[in-house]
Amino acid sequence: IALGAAGGAASAAPSKGEAESLKSRAQGLVEAGYPAVLAAVTDSKGESAGVAVGKGNLETGQAPPMDGEVRIGSNTKTFVAVVVMQMVQEGKVGLDEPIETYLPGLIKGEGIDGSRITVRQLLQHTSGLPEYTDTTPGSGDIFQVKDHYIPPRDLLDTALGKPAQFEPGAQWKYTNTNYLVLGMLVERVSQRPVGEQIDERIVKKLGLSHTYFPAPGDRSIKGTHPQGYHLSAEGKLEDITEMDPVWGWAAGAMVSTPSELNTFFQAVFDGRLLTQSSIDEMKNGAVDASSYLGPGTVYGLGLIGRSLSCGGTSWGHGGTIHGYQTDNAVGPDGTAVTVAVTALPSAIADQNNLESSAKEKHQRNKDAVDATLCHK
């Protein structure tokens, strides 16, 4: 079991008790069936302690690397949301402007009209746009399609071939298509690739060296990393580390480490990336998200708010992509925690009782985040 400083000097670490508590919870997650757990807690001064337990490679039995790189799935959405909010600050984008203003003629279909969907509704998942990920690619055997390159425009066409889920603004429904469209908005406004905008506006600004948006066709994880695993059609955990994450694109393609995710989320709220009014805008007016994200959750503009067991609200996001799950948030006192596991809860769940078993497995990850932020 490795325990040490993540992304900082050995002496730079939150309280020993906090790190030990995170370590024991991480060990509990391995016992629950996750191949490996990589976690980091970062205090409000930016000092981190890391944990790495389990097996980073099931074939060799090798230990997972401390603060290794993992696919961060939907945490990508918060990076995209920050870029959009920066563009709002710069007067290049209007939150309550219709997406039609920026992507004329693109967003249309059955019950779908880009002139009636605002940028804010896309950020908040209240647009009513149909979902693309329920038909591509992981609805069948992911191992058959994991190396397929599907251009983002094709993913959008898949979504727009379906009817709208609801009238814009009428409901909330977590939908990856919203962030596909926001990625296209960023590219249209900047005339540059969305990954490059994230790199220039966020990654370089914060000095992150293990956080990146994969280049087209990039299937491997560049830096030191644990292997990610998924359940094969034969019911075995198989290595799925190498895959083309393009189908996640601006909704879920990025790679980072636990400590760098903590740094990013702290920077979202401490003024390094956004003005206070932008930060308030992202949190205020957050809508009830308990139908999908569980009791006590709300969704702002690219942010998930969660009621803590000790009172107050944590803000972060979290991400799911084949092989990796990350749960992360920043607490009211500025402490940040990320817990990354190297298989989805559904992959280690009881397959005969899949839904409730996967929910129970994932709840343990969320509980580890809550306990750390509550200094338990």
Where do the model's predicted regions map?
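Residue-level preference for non-acidic, small/hydrophobic
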Residues: 26, 45, 77-80, 84, ...
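Short, surface-exposed loop or secondary-structure junction motifs
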Residues: 111-314, 318
